Design a protein with these regions (language model features):
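Histidine-anchored nucleotide/phosphate-binding helix
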Residues: 1-21
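A generic local structural motif
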Residues: 9, 45-47, 94-98
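Short coil/turn connectors at secondary-structure junctions
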Residues: 15-19, 55-57, 105-107
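Short beta-alpha junction loops
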Residues: 25-28, 65-66
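N-terminal beta-loop-helix "entrance" segment that forms/cooperates
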Residues: 27-41
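A glycine-rich helix N-cap at a beta->alpha junction
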Residues: 37-66
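N-terminal glycine-rich phosphate/adenylate-binding segment common to multiple enzyme folds
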Residues: 63-112
Length: 112
């Protein structure tokens, strides 16, 4: 995740546009608002949120991967009868359809 974030920051600094970041498999854990990294570790969740808010970049979680890993939005928690959620507002849940739309809109796909 750090490599992906660094790549995004570098791409933006060099004038490129990022239209969406799609998190899949273990990448969905970046949206978990309840992570508490040690003081000498990078807070990936906060860094992704900052990138999104500073550059208006949508952050999309694969909903299937997120649910399998216990990462829930408020809607997912309600639909699955869970009393709590842990995905922050900066991240939305979506399916592979959102990934396909992003691929169609972009001139390239970078995968980490």
């Amino acid at each position: 995740s750090f490599r992906a974030l660094s790549f995004c920051q570098s791409a933006l600094a060099n004038g490129h546009q990022i239209i969406n970041v799609f998190f899949y498999q273990d990448g969905v854990t970046n949206s978990n608002a309840l992570t508490c990294p040690a003081s000498d570790e990078i807070d990936m969740h906060s860094n992704w949120q900052s990138l999104s808010s500073q550059h208006s970049i949508p952050l999309t979680n694969c909903v299937s991967a997120a649910l399998r890993r216990g990462v829930l939005s408020p809607q997912d928690a309600t639909e699955n009868g869970k009393p709590q959620w842990n995905s922050s507002d900066a991240f939305t849940m979506g399916g592979l359809g959102e990934l396909v739309v992003g691929i169609e809109q972009a001139d390239r796909l970078i995968s980490f």
